Every structure is written in C-alpha cells, then in structure tokens.
Amino acid sequence: MDDLAQLQSCSNELATAITSLASYAGSGNTQQAINNQSPFEPEEVQRAKGNILAVATKLRTLICGPTDFLQHLASQVSEILACLRWLGEFQILACIPLMGSAPIKDIADLTNVPESRLRRIIRLTATAGFLREPERDHVAHTPLSASFFSNPSLLDAAMFLSESAAPIALQMPQTAQVKEKSSSPPSNGTPCDLALPRGTEFHTACKRRPKLNRQWLAYLHHAAGLHTADDIAAVLTQLDWPKLTNGRDGSIIEYAISRVDHCHAQVGVSSWSTSIARRLAHFYPALHFTVQISDPAVAITQEEFHPRITATSRILGTRQTAAGAAVYILHLPFASSSPSAVMTELAVHLDVLRSRSGILLILTPRLLPQPGSLPDPEVEATARSRDLALGQMADEGEMEMLELLETIDTVRDSLGKLVVTSKLRSRNNLVVAVTVEYQRDLPS
C-alpha cells in the first residue's frame, strides 16, 4: 500500500473512531467522555480513544519528515519535559486556581520565580494542552494540567522522567565505553552507576530514598505501561475458571517471586500477589488459593488476610511440592537478570503438571510484543521504552515473546513436554499471560 492509500485508510479509521467517541459523548457529558481516564469508563470509550491515538501516531509517521521529527523532539519532548520539572520544582500548579484564571505576575510573585520565565514556560506548555492563557498575561488550568495537581502521582512520574530516566538514558554512549574498558560485570557499568554513587544498585537506592522510590513507582504506573494487579486479574477472568476446576478441589497455587518485578517488590511482593488472589477469590467464591512467596522473610499482613487464601513460602527453583491444584499461576522473573531461572521454574512444575491431565500452568511474565505486531505502535513503544529504561538503570530487561515460546518448547522429560495452549491479551492487545499444559508424547 502506497503512502496516499495509507493516508486514506487512516482517515477512514480516524473518522470511525471519532464517530464512536462522539456517539457516547452525545449521551452524556462530552468533555468528561473525552478527558476522563478512569479505568471504570466503558470499554467502547477506551477503545475509541485508543484507536484515535493509534491512528494519530500512524499519521505522524506517514507525513513527518526529518525536520519535523527533530522539531517535535525539541519542543514536545525535551523542552516540555524540562518545563514540567520546573513547574513541579517550584510548585506552580498548586498556585493556579482550578476554576478561573490568575495573573501570571501574581503566580510569579507567590512562588518567587521570574515572571518572564514563567510566562515563556506557560506559553510553551500550552501548545501541548498543558495550562492555557485565556487572556493576555493570565494563566488557567486545562483538564490535563489540573489532573497533575489533583493526582500528585502524575507529577511524580514526570519528575522521575526528567530527573532520572532522561539523564540516565542520555548517558548510554558513556556507559558503552565504560563496559568496553572495564572487566567488571555488566551490572557495574549501567548508566545508573554513573548517576548514583559507585556500586550503588538502583533498587537499593530506591529503598534508601523514599522520594526516588515513590517517583519510580509513579513512572511505572503512569508512563511505563506496567500492568497492575487489577489488570492481570481482569485478564485472568477471560478463563473459564469453573470449568478449569470442575471435579477438583478448586485449589489454585500462585507463586510470587520477590524480585519478579521491582515495582512490586518495593510495595511488597506479598501485597501485590495476594491482591491478584483476592480479586479472583472475589469473582469465584468456590476457589481456594495458596500464595507461595519466594522470600520466607516476607510475611502476609493481617490486612491481606482472606479466609480462602493461604500463604506459604517456596524458594525459587525448588521442586513444586503443592500437588493436587487445578491451576498454577507463576509470576516469572526477568529473563535477563536470571536467564536460567525461567527454565528452572518451568522444569520444577513438570511433575505436578504430568500427574493429571487438564492441569493448567499460567505464566505472567513481562513480555515485549513481537516487533510491529500491535495495531497501536505507541503501545509497543511504551513497552520497549520501559525495557530500555530497566536496562539503563538496573541492567535488567524483559523477555521477547519469541524467547518465552522457545524456552517453553525446550522444557520436557522422557514422557512429554510443555506446550502453550493460549495467550491472554489486555485491552491494548499486549499478551499478559500465557497458559501452558503438559502434553504426553504420542506413541511411536
């Protein structure tokens, strides 16, 4: 398809998506339908918004030349990000009324910043829909900027991008030189080491610096496209759980690895994992859950207690001794940080999967989509940006889909092997979970 035909196709897709969103907005609050980002908004609205953004990205790719590309980077990426940091540093957003407007001079005097600098920053961010100048030398919130005031976690994410992620990312060339000249392990040559005290791991720094940890979690949640426990539980409801446990005791084993995801580790791996079990227990009252935690020192608190959830421990890589369950949910570690751990964890489940037909193993690794496989290129860009950020800050990385499939295919014993039976996808078409069963070899 040539560029002109692609433009026409994108035009038709855009018109359809806008009509869909307008149809919903016509039955209610138009502005709310457009600006609301609640996870509870109707699925058709979220789909229409996603389609509009996806088509907009395709259009930009089709018509953007090299000069346009650089100008976009200069204004909408580097300078806008710097402006957000500046606004956050001087707490400007909190001084602007949520309703109406205020003189820019008054805001400058209140925050003790130069009026001319504030005016320039407001006028630049306004081009991105962040703040506006309703009349000359006055500033007012837009729905976008107001959300950064009402939800400070959004500003934390922006501050992490500007203070940590972007500076560390820009140090990649220096890091490559460090690795070439040093005989130390790769983890000693990450950009994070150049920004933090020598030898200090990023996640250790997060534990020692609550502000950094808070901003890191906000970045993962808002900017990095990380799936939450709610997201994963929602995807798992795509399975027919009553059918999976039919004729069995309804027992589900869930294994949480303490360093499966440093976002979860920082907020408490037990809390993250039991939150998935609690959500599934809420939807399926006949099921009983056993949550296995890899670190025996991690305890389940009273707040996390549920009458149908039992907590135990199992060290990573040790044999799975909890037999008799209908389903095993396994949160895999990073492939790059522990390349053999994924293979080992799959292998230690061979015995329980082989013991009875129909037993299901559900894997919830953080997977990178196959290149170019998603309808929305921004979704893939977000996932790959997160993967690069993890590598730059902690020398970790996420698993490619093909890597996981190849790994599963190699796990076997003398009687059979593991096979993938389905892929469970989120609303944006990312694979969130993979279901696996044991398949016996056919008689020769």
From Swiss-Prot:
Q: Does the keyword Transcription regulation apply?
A: yes
Q: Does the keyword Transcription regulation apply?
A: yes
* Cellular localisation: Nucleus
**Key words of the record:** DNA-binding, Nucleus, Transcription, Transcription regulation
Q: Which residues form the HTH iclR-type domain?
A: 74-144
In its UniProt entry, what is this protein called? Transcriptional coactivator nsrH
The role this protein plays is:
Transcriptional coactivator; part of the gene cluster that mediates the biosynthesis of the tetrahydroxanthone dimer neosartorin, which exhibits antibacterial activity.
Which superkingdom heads the taxonomic lineage of this protein's source?
Answer: Eukaryota
Per its UniProt record, what PANTHER family does this chain match?
MONODICTYPHENONE CLUSTER TRANSCRIPTIONAL COACTIVATOR MDPA, PUTATIVE (AFU_ORTHOLOGUE AFUA_4G14580)-RELATED
Which GO cellular component term is one of those annotated?
A: nucleus
Single GO molecular function? DNA binding
- InterPro entries in the record: SAM-dependent_MTases_sf, WH-like_DNA-bd_sf, WH_DNA-bd_sf
- Could you read off the lineage of the organism from its UniProt record? Eukaryota, Fungi, Dikarya, Ascomycota, Pezizomycotina
| DNA-binding region of this protein | 104-123
